[in-house]
């Protein structure tokens, strides 16, 4: 088992013929992902990377039976791309694009909830179930099928956790980058709930960062509902207050959202926290005895 995606997931790409869509679709195909086509308005009826191109998501879904879409569309047009995917009946949307206006995301979030559609992102690396399906921009070769579920607000820090779990021989069930924006399609709790139910996942690594209250909310959820061991790390311990650190959501505002507060919340919930990414492997060794 795994969560969200597996070897049978049929995937289309929106923004398929652009440079990002092309490069990452090539990588996904090489990894073994079941890419079945792509969407670029005006280029319908052509082929790209040996796959059919469609003008609309609805046409792509009708022709291919795709259930997942990955979006590499410039930020100003992303809202329409997501709404189009929802309207076409796509059940899993993975939005890689960074810089989508917050107001656009408010509209999108309402529509996602109304339609019961799961979205990962925006501003995220995507989702990978090692050895089966890779949707996003992750380096496939560092992953290894296994028993640790990883959920993170950061892309590159996810890869650090992956490398450690691979090097220590644990491997990963599924890795989910939920993204670094203030309004994500899915939050920590959504993914923790899935990992808790997934029989393949024996432990969870959760990587948070300063800003917002997502980690504190996740800690409260873990305390009540998660029986599997969780290893937690928070990025931004030395971040100055009021300065945005890379991600739009990574800012300590009004004295709230500091790394220390988040570490304290996780520790109070029984999470095994580490103060350095380099300690994740060792921490997992202690909780997976």
From Swiss-Prot:
Its EC number is 6.2.1.5. Keywords: Ligase, Nucleotide-binding, Tricarboxylic acid cycle. InterPro entries: Cit_synth/succinyl-CoA_lig_AS, Citrt_syn/SCS-alpha_CS, CoA-bd, CoA_lig_alpha, NAD(P)-bd_dom_sf, SUCC_ACL_C, Succinyl-CoA_synth-like. Signal peptide: none annotated. Substrate binds at residue 159. It catalyses: succinate + ATP + CoA = succinyl-CoA + ADP + phosphate; GTP + succinate + CoA = succinyl-CoA + GDP + phosphate. CoA binds at residues 17-20, 43, 96-98. Pfam families: CoA_binding (PF02629), Ligase_CoA (PF00549). Pathway: Carbohydrate metabolism; tricarboxylic acid cycle; succinate from succinyl-CoA (ligase route): step 1/1. It is an enzyme of class 6 (ligase). GO terms for cellular component: cytoplasm; cytosol; succinate-CoA ligase complex (ADP-forming). It comes from the Bacteria. Exhibits two interesting properties: 'substrate synergism', in which the enzyme is most active for the catalysis of its partial reactions only when all the substrate-binding sites are occupied, and 'catalytic cooperativity' between alternating active sites in the tetramer, whereby the interaction of substrates (particularly ATP) at one site is needed to promote catalysis at the other. One of its GO terms (molecular function) is succinate-CoA ligase (ADP-forming) activity. The active site is at residue 247. GO terms for biological process: tricarboxylic acid cycle. Succinyl-CoA synthetase (SCS) of E.coli catalyzes its reaction via three steps that involve phosphoryl enzyme and enzyme-bound succinyl phosphate as intermediates. Heterotetramer of two alpha and two beta subunits. HAMAP family: Succ_CoA_alpha. Belongs to the succinate/malate CoA ligase alpha subunit family. Succinyl-CoA synthetase functions in the citric acid cycle (TCA), coupling the hydrolysis of succinyl-CoA to the synthesis of either ATP or GTP and thus represents the only step of substrate-level phosphorylation in the TCA. The alpha subunit of the enzyme binds the substrates coenzyme A and phosphate, while succinate binding and nucleotide specificity is provided by the beta subunit. Can use either ATP or GTP, but prefers ATP. This is Succinate--CoA ligase [ADP-forming] subunit alpha. It comes from Escherichia coli (strain K12).
